[in-house]
Amino acid sequence: MEFDRGLLQALTEKTAAEICKWAYDFPYNIYNFINQPNEYLLNRETWGTEQFCLIQDEKTVGYVSCQIEDDCLWIGWSMHPKLCGKGDGHLFVLKCTEEIKKRFNYEGSLYIRVAASNQRAVKAYQKAGFVYQKQIQDEVAYSNHIENF
């Protein structure tokens, strides 16, 4: 799937409720929000400032969160479960990073954390140009630039 028509929008009651119902197949079911209340996702104060959804053709195709920590922009995301495993994750990542950079007028490095065991996501991040930085407990950190971290 191409994500070229996707637009980053602030979460709303409707999109947050929809994302909370997403169900991933094993072994990715650890990312399910079903029956696991997520206080951060439901925190309306962060909608449009830290939390967004990617909308394409009037459908929620992704969830994006971002925080600036020590002048580093950290991004997290989830792609709609029905779109996962098709080899298009890197296109989703590229679209989300493009939209975040535009929204925040940000030209610096972007950082992501991912479970080291989530090889599907790791492949997508690498294909999108992110480079391994270091291990952080059971997660690995990637950046879109090679640098000392």
Where are these regions (language model features)?
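Conserved N-terminal entry element of GNAT/NAT acetyltransferase domains
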Residues: 1-14, 148-149
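Short alpha-helical segment within the catalytic ATP-binding CA
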Residues: 78, 91, 120
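Acetyl-CoA-dependent GNAT
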Residues: 13-76, 80-84, 99, 103
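Conserved acetyl-CoA-binding loop-helix of GNAT-fold acetyltransferases
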Residues: 85-100, 123-127
